[in-house]
Amino acid sequence: MRGSLRTTITAASALVFVVGVFTMTASPLISPNASLQSEQEGPSGYQQGVARVADGWVFTGTTVMARTNEQLKIVKQNTQPIPLEWKRKGFNHVGDPDVAGKFLYAPLEQPQYERGDQAIARYNAKTLELVDVVPVTQHEASFITVDPKTMIAYSMDRFGGNALLRYDVRKKWAPLPPLAMDRVVENVQGADIADGSVWLSTSDPQNNLYRVDLKTGATTFLGSAGHVGGEGEGIDATKLKSGLLHVLTVDPTRNPVWFGHFDVS
């Protein structure tokens, strides 16, 4: 049922959901682990991305977006988030968004990746009304995340890699030197910024999660978002009672979309 809550109480039950607590064996130090705390059934049709707002969430689907309350009941929709002008340019996909201040930022993607042009749209985070669209020079655009302190935005040129693109939002999205990562992360679907890190969700074979240090680019494996065989999607990183990481994962049967809440220890 939509908005229903399932809680993982023990490590054994976490394994039932194909969510384990993972450790890195290459170092004597204990690495962070993402562990599932609870899980909800997400709103149908909104599987691409998620961002936190004051009284709930914003979810994106391929060509739609909606704001929900804490129980994931839809309270506001934008069924045409891609403006006609950009549809005519081939843009047909909304990715994983982010909220900074009073605005929602969402990547708009067109599928002819070798053109090397994508776009970032800005919306009123409360009403979901479009404010403007900015073109960016990158091949793919599965996510955008904006650091609210610096107003530097992060994305990736391709659907995975070993660097995060950076833009100065205050200077009309002027490109900045990329943040080099110390490992390649494939199939990145979503990202969000919290606690001095960029947190990544992927749709690799295990739907793995990663943390990238904003200062050093050190990239740490955190574990799986679960539902292996399904597709990992967007992520939000906000400290709540339910956890720090909030991740969308499409069920292996394609329905429902799971909204998992993870602590990182």
Question: Predicted segment positions?
Answer:
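Surface loop/turn motifs at the tips and blade-to-blade linkers of beta-strand repeat domains
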Residues: 38-43, 79-81, 85-89, 133-139, ...
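Beta-strand-rich domains and repeat architectures in extracellular enzymes and scaffolds
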Residues: 38-63, 93-96
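Beta-rich catalytic cores
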Residues: 44-46, 91-93, 116, 138-142, ...
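Beta-propeller domains
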Residues: 57-83, 115
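Structural motif
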Residues: 64-69, 113-121, 161-167, 206-212, ...
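Blade-loop segments of beta-propeller domains
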Residues: 74-110
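Conserved blade-ending motifs and adjacent loop-strand segments that build the rim/top face
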Residues: 187, 218-239
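Blade-level signature of beta-propeller repeat domains, shared across WD40, Kelch, NHL, RCC1
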Residues: 234-265
